[in-house]
Design a protein with these regions (language model features):
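Phosphate/pyrophosphate-binding catalytic cores of soluble transferases and nucleic-acid-acting enzymes
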Residues: 1-316
Protein backbone atom coordinates (compact mmCIF):
# COMPACT_ATOMS: atom_id res chain seq x y z
CA UNK A 1 0.00 0.00 0.00
CA UNK A 2 2.82 2.42 0.75
CA UNK A 3 3.96 2.39 -2.87
CA UNK A 4 0.60 3.60 -4.10
CA UNK A 5 1.06 6.82 -2.16
CA UNK A 6 4.21 7.59 -4.12
CA UNK A 7 2.44 7.53 -7.48
CA UNK A 8 2.01 10.79 -9.28
CA UNK A 9 -0.26 9.60 -12.05
CA UNK A 10 -2.78 12.20 -13.24
CA UNK A 11 -6.29 11.70 -11.92
CA UNK A 12 -9.33 13.76 -12.84
CA UNK A 13 -12.31 14.10 -10.49
CA UNK A 14 -15.76 15.51 -11.23
CA UNK A 15 -17.58 16.28 -7.98
CA UNK A 16 -20.50 18.29 -6.65
CA UNK A 17 -24.02 17.90 -5.33
CA UNK A 18 -26.62 15.60 -6.79
CA UNK A 19 -28.37 16.54 -10.05
CA UNK A 20 -25.61 18.80 -11.40
CA UNK A 21 -24.69 16.67 -14.42
CA UNK A 22 -21.50 15.04 -13.12
CA UNK A 23 -22.08 11.82 -15.04
CA UNK A 24 -22.58 13.51 -18.41
CA UNK A 25 -19.50 15.69 -17.98
CA UNK A 26 -17.38 12.77 -16.83
CA UNK A 27 -18.39 10.71 -19.86
CA UNK A 28 -17.72 13.62 -22.24
CA UNK A 29 -14.23 14.12 -20.80
CA UNK A 30 -13.54 10.38 -20.91
CA UNK A 31 -14.46 10.34 -24.60
CA UNK A 32 -12.19 13.28 -25.37
CA UNK A 33 -9.16 12.28 -23.29
CA UNK A 34 -9.22 8.49 -23.38
CA UNK A 35 -10.47 8.01 -19.85
CA UNK A 36 -12.52 5.55 -17.87
CA UNK A 37 -14.87 6.30 -14.98
CA UNK A 38 -14.43 5.28 -11.35
CA UNK A 39 -17.73 5.82 -9.56
CA UNK A 40 -17.36 7.64 -6.24
CA UNK A 41 -20.93 7.01 -5.12
CA UNK A 42 -21.39 4.95 -1.97
CA UNK A 43 -24.65 3.37 -3.17
CA UNK A 44 -23.92 2.66 -6.83
CA UNK A 45 -21.57 -0.14 -5.77
CA UNK A 46 -24.70 -2.23 -5.04
CA UNK A 47 -26.54 -4.34 -7.57
CA UNK A 48 -30.25 -3.71 -8.08
CA UNK A 49 -30.26 -0.20 -6.62
CA UNK A 50 -30.47 1.49 -9.99
CA UNK A 51 -33.23 4.10 -10.07
CA UNK A 52 -32.84 5.41 -6.53
CA UNK A 53 -29.09 5.92 -6.92
CA UNK A 54 -29.39 7.53 -10.38
CA UNK A 55 -27.05 4.84 -11.66
CA UNK A 56 -25.70 5.49 -15.15
CA UNK A 57 -27.64 3.66 -17.87
CA UNK A 58 -25.94 1.75 -20.71
CA UNK A 59 -27.02 4.50 -23.10
CA UNK A 60 -25.55 7.22 -20.89
CA UNK A 61 -22.13 5.55 -20.73
CA UNK A 62 -21.55 6.07 -24.48
CA UNK A 63 -19.48 2.92 -24.29
CA UNK A 64 -17.12 4.32 -21.65
CA UNK A 65 -16.27 1.69 -19.00
CA UNK A 66 -17.60 2.51 -15.54
CA UNK A 67 -15.90 0.92 -12.54
CA UNK A 68 -17.00 0.47 -8.90
CA UNK A 69 -20.59 -0.03 -10.03
CA UNK A 70 -22.77 -3.13 -9.48
CA UNK A 71 -20.08 -5.06 -7.62
CA UNK A 72 -21.87 -6.04 -4.40
CA UNK A 73 -25.19 -7.41 -3.21
CA UNK A 74 -27.22 -4.97 -1.08
CA UNK A 75 -26.63 -7.03 2.06
CA UNK A 76 -22.84 -6.67 1.83
CA UNK A 77 -20.89 -3.92 3.58
CA UNK A 78 -18.47 -1.55 1.87
CA UNK A 79 -16.42 0.96 3.83
CA UNK A 80 -14.45 4.07 2.95
CA UNK A 81 -11.26 2.07 3.38
CA UNK A 82 -12.62 -0.56 0.97
CA UNK A 83 -13.32 2.13 -1.62
CA UNK A 84 -9.89 3.69 -1.21
CA UNK A 85 -8.24 0.31 -1.79
CA UNK A 86 -10.46 -0.48 -4.78
CA UNK A 87 -9.96 2.93 -6.36
CA UNK A 88 -6.21 2.63 -5.88
CA UNK A 89 -6.18 -0.70 -7.68
CA UNK A 90 -8.30 0.69 -10.49
CA UNK A 91 -6.09 3.77 -10.83
CA UNK A 92 -2.98 1.63 -11.12
CA UNK A 93 -4.56 -0.53 -13.81
CA UNK A 94 -5.98 2.38 -15.81
CA UNK A 95 -2.75 4.37 -15.70
CA UNK A 96 -0.76 1.31 -16.77
CA UNK A 97 -3.06 0.99 -19.77
CA UNK A 98 -2.64 4.64 -20.68
CA UNK A 99 -6.15 5.57 -19.60
CA UNK A 100 -7.04 8.70 -17.64
CA UNK A 101 -8.78 7.71 -14.38
CA UNK A 102 -11.83 9.94 -13.91
CA UNK A 103 -13.42 9.86 -10.46
CA UNK A 104 -17.10 10.84 -10.71
CA UNK A 105 -19.46 11.11 -7.77
CA UNK A 106 -20.87 12.99 -4.85
CA UNK A 107 -19.69 10.94 -1.87
CA UNK A 108 -17.18 13.42 -0.53
CA UNK A 109 -15.65 11.04 1.98
CA UNK A 110 -14.76 8.64 -0.83
CA UNK A 111 -13.28 11.35 -3.04
CA UNK A 112 -11.22 12.97 -0.31
CA UNK A 113 -9.98 9.67 1.14
CA UNK A 114 -8.73 8.52 -2.25
CA UNK A 115 -7.24 11.75 -3.53
CA UNK A 116 -5.61 12.81 -0.28
CA UNK A 117 -4.35 9.40 0.73
CA UNK A 118 -5.88 9.17 4.20
CA UNK A 119 -5.26 5.81 5.80
CA UNK A 120 -7.69 4.34 8.28
CA UNK A 121 -6.53 2.40 11.31
CA UNK A 122 -4.84 -0.85 10.38
CA UNK A 123 -6.58 -2.62 13.23
CA UNK A 124 -9.91 -4.06 12.22
CA UNK A 125 -12.71 -1.72 13.18
CA UNK A 126 -15.83 -3.22 14.75
CA UNK A 127 -18.49 -4.10 12.21
CA UNK A 128 -20.52 -1.07 11.25
CA UNK A 129 -18.27 1.50 12.95
CA UNK A 130 -17.28 3.33 9.77
CA UNK A 131 -20.86 3.32 8.55
CA UNK A 132 -21.99 4.63 11.95
CA UNK A 133 -19.48 7.48 11.83
CA UNK A 134 -20.54 8.40 8.31
CA UNK A 135 -24.18 8.42 9.43
CA UNK A 136 -23.32 10.61 12.43
CA UNK A 137 -21.50 13.02 10.14
CA UNK A 138 -24.56 13.31 7.91
CA UNK A 139 -26.95 13.72 10.86
CA UNK A 140 -24.98 15.90 13.28
CA UNK A 141 -22.62 17.71 10.95
CA UNK A 142 -18.82 18.03 11.06
CA UNK A 143 -18.69 20.52 13.93
CA UNK A 144 -20.24 18.04 16.38
CA UNK A 145 -17.78 15.29 15.50
CA UNK A 146 -14.86 17.69 15.75
CA UNK A 147 -16.03 18.68 19.23
CA UNK A 148 -16.13 15.00 20.18
CA UNK A 149 -12.56 14.60 18.94
CA UNK A 150 -11.45 17.59 21.02
CA UNK A 151 -12.83 15.82 24.09
CA UNK A 152 -11.24 12.39 23.50
CA UNK A 153 -8.00 13.39 21.75
CA UNK A 154 -7.28 17.12 22.08
CA UNK A 155 -3.76 16.74 20.66
CA UNK A 156 -5.06 15.18 17.45
CA UNK A 157 -7.82 17.78 17.24
CA UNK A 158 -5.27 20.58 17.53
CA UNK A 159 -3.32 19.11 14.62
CA UNK A 160 -6.36 18.61 12.37
CA UNK A 161 -8.28 21.43 10.73
CA UNK A 162 -11.98 21.27 11.67
CA UNK A 163 -12.89 21.19 7.96
CA UNK A 164 -10.70 18.15 7.25
CA UNK A 165 -13.57 15.78 7.89
CA UNK A 166 -11.74 12.71 6.61
CA UNK A 167 -8.97 13.01 9.21
CA UNK A 168 -11.49 13.83 11.95
CA UNK A 169 -13.39 10.63 11.14
CA UNK A 170 -10.17 8.65 10.98
CA UNK A 171 -9.10 9.87 14.42
CA UNK A 172 -12.51 9.10 15.94
CA UNK A 173 -12.57 5.68 14.30
CA UNK A 174 -9.17 4.86 15.75
CA UNK A 175 -10.23 5.95 19.23
CA UNK A 176 -13.54 4.10 19.19
CA UNK A 177 -11.99 0.94 17.74
CA UNK A 178 -8.92 0.77 19.98
CA UNK A 179 -9.60 2.99 22.98
CA UNK A 180 -6.29 4.72 22.24
CA UNK A 181 -5.62 8.21 20.95
CA UNK A 182 -4.43 8.60 17.39
CA UNK A 183 -2.01 11.26 18.59
CA UNK A 184 -0.09 8.50 20.38
CA UNK A 185 1.04 7.14 17.02
CA UNK A 186 4.23 8.47 15.47
CA UNK A 187 3.67 11.19 12.92
CA UNK A 188 5.92 9.27 10.53
CA UNK A 189 3.24 6.61 10.17
CA UNK A 190 0.85 9.06 8.55
CA UNK A 191 0.69 9.09 4.73
CA UNK A 192 1.31 12.23 2.68
CA UNK A 193 -1.74 14.38 2.03
CA UNK A 194 -2.08 13.92 -1.73
CA UNK A 195 -0.88 10.70 -3.37
CA UNK A 196 -1.95 11.60 -6.90
CA UNK A 197 -1.57 14.58 -9.16
CA UNK A 198 -5.21 15.53 -9.34
CA UNK A 199 -7.49 18.02 -11.04
CA UNK A 200 -10.80 18.30 -9.21
CA UNK A 201 -13.68 19.92 -11.10
CA UNK A 202 -16.71 20.91 -9.04
CA UNK A 203 -20.16 21.48 -10.53
CA UNK A 204 -22.74 23.83 -9.03
CA UNK A 205 -25.40 26.28 -10.13
CA UNK A 206 -25.19 30.06 -9.59
CA UNK A 207 -28.63 30.04 -7.96
CA UNK A 208 -29.58 27.52 -5.28
CA UNK A 209 -33.17 27.54 -6.57
CA UNK A 210 -31.95 26.17 -9.89
CA UNK A 211 -30.31 23.23 -8.17
CA UNK A 212 -33.47 22.54 -6.18
CA UNK A 213 -35.60 22.58 -9.33
CA UNK A 214 -33.24 20.07 -10.91
CA UNK A 215 -33.49 17.84 -7.85
CA UNK A 216 -37.29 17.96 -7.84
CA UNK A 217 -37.38 17.13 -11.54
CA UNK A 218 -34.99 14.24 -11.02
CA UNK A 219 -37.22 12.76 -8.31
CA UNK A 220 -40.25 13.04 -10.60
CA UNK A 221 -38.35 11.22 -13.34
CA UNK A 222 -37.23 8.56 -10.88
CA UNK A 223 -40.85 7.92 -9.98
CA UNK A 224 -41.68 7.51 -13.66
CA UNK A 225 -38.72 5.14 -14.06
CA UNK A 226 -39.89 2.73 -11.35
CA UNK A 227 -38.45 4.03 -8.10
CA UNK A 228 -41.46 2.92 -6.06
CA UNK A 229 -41.05 -0.73 -7.06
CA UNK A 230 -37.33 -0.58 -6.28
CA UNK A 231 -38.05 0.98 -2.89
CA UNK A 232 -40.61 -1.74 -2.16
CA UNK A 233 -37.93 -4.39 -2.75
CA UNK A 234 -35.64 -2.62 -0.30
CA UNK A 235 -38.50 -2.37 2.20
CA UNK A 236 -39.27 -6.07 1.92
CA UNK A 237 -35.61 -6.89 2.58
CA UNK A 238 -34.88 -4.04 5.00
CA UNK A 239 -33.49 -6.29 7.72
CA UNK A 240 -30.80 -7.68 5.37
CA UNK A 241 -30.35 -4.54 3.26
CA UNK A 242 -29.35 -2.36 6.21
CA UNK A 243 -27.33 0.16 4.22
CA UNK A 244 -29.92 0.53 1.47
CA UNK A 245 -32.73 0.78 4.01
CA UNK A 246 -31.10 3.93 5.41
CA UNK A 247 -30.36 5.48 2.03
CA UNK A 248 -32.09 8.55 0.64
CA UNK A 249 -34.47 7.38 -2.07
CA UNK A 250 -35.81 4.35 -0.25
CA UNK A 251 -36.51 4.99 3.43
CA UNK A 252 -38.82 7.90 2.58
CA UNK A 253 -41.36 5.41 1.17
CA UNK A 254 -41.44 3.05 4.14
CA UNK A 255 -44.42 4.85 5.77
CA UNK A 256 -46.35 4.33 2.53
CA UNK A 257 -45.60 0.61 2.47
CA UNK A 258 -46.62 0.33 6.12
CA UNK A 259 -49.93 2.04 5.41
CA UNK A 260 -49.05 5.07 7.52
CA UNK A 261 -48.91 7.67 4.74
CA UNK A 262 -50.18 8.51 1.30
CA UNK A 263 -47.69 8.40 -1.56
CA UNK A 264 -47.52 12.13 -2.34
CA UNK A 265 -46.14 13.18 1.08
CA UNK A 266 -43.45 10.50 0.73
CA UNK A 267 -42.40 11.89 -2.64
CA UNK A 268 -42.23 15.40 -1.20
CA UNK A 269 -40.21 14.08 1.74
CA UNK A 270 -37.75 12.55 -0.71
CA UNK A 271 -37.39 15.84 -2.55
CA UNK A 272 -36.68 17.66 0.70
CA UNK A 273 -34.22 14.99 1.85
CA UNK A 274 -32.43 15.23 -1.49
CA UNK A 275 -32.20 19.01 -1.22
CA UNK A 276 -30.79 18.71 2.30
CA UNK A 277 -28.28 16.14 1.09
CA UNK A 278 -27.19 18.44 -1.73
CA UNK A 279 -26.50 21.18 0.82
CA UNK A 280 -24.32 18.81 2.84
CA UNK A 281 -22.47 17.77 -0.31
CA UNK A 282 -21.79 21.39 -1.18
CA UNK A 283 -20.51 22.08 2.33
CA UNK A 284 -18.13 19.15 2.07
CA UNK A 285 -16.75 19.97 -1.36
CA UNK A 286 -16.49 23.71 -0.64
CA UNK A 287 -14.12 22.81 2.19
CA UNK A 288 -11.94 20.63 -0.03
CA UNK A 289 -8.72 22.25 -1.19
CA UNK A 290 -8.07 22.85 -4.86
CA UNK A 291 -11.54 22.34 -6.34
CA UNK A 292 -12.06 24.30 -9.57
CA UNK A 293 -15.72 25.28 -9.58
CA UNK A 294 -17.70 25.45 -12.81
CA UNK A 295 -21.19 26.68 -13.60
CA UNK A 296 -23.19 23.52 -14.31
CA UNK A 297 -25.65 25.51 -16.44
CA UNK A 298 -23.06 27.30 -18.58
CA UNK A 299 -23.42 26.65 -22.34
CA UNK A 300 -19.65 26.22 -22.61
CA UNK A 301 -19.33 23.90 -19.60
CA UNK A 302 -17.85 20.98 -21.54
CA UNK A 303 -15.47 23.23 -23.47
CA UNK A 304 -14.29 24.92 -20.28
CA UNK A 305 -13.80 21.59 -18.51
CA UNK A 306 -11.96 20.19 -21.52
CA UNK A 307 -9.62 23.18 -21.64
CA UNK A 308 -8.78 22.79 -17.95
CA UNK A 309 -8.21 19.07 -18.40
CA UNK A 310 -5.96 19.60 -21.41
CA UNK A 311 -3.89 22.14 -19.50
CA UNK A 312 -3.66 19.78 -16.53
CA UNK A 313 -2.48 16.85 -18.65
CA UNK A 314 -0.04 18.97 -20.65
CA UNK A 315 1.61 20.34 -17.52
CA UNK A 316 2.21 16.78 -16.29
Amino acid sequence: MAASFEKKHPVLAVVGPTATGKTALGVALAEQFGGEIISADSMQIYKGLDVGTAKVTPEETHGIPHHAVDLLEPDQTFSVADFTALAGTLETDLSARGKLPILVGGTGLYVQSFLYGVRFTAEKAPDGLREQLAAELAEKGPAALYEELKQVDPEAAAAIHPNNQVRVLRALEHYRATGRRLSEQKAASLPPERPYRALVLGLDFPERAQLYRRIDLRVDRMMEAGLLAEAETVFANRVRFKTAAQAIGYKEFFPYFMGESELTPCVEKLKQASRNYAKRQLTWFRHMDGVVWLDAAAPDLKARAAALTQEFITKG
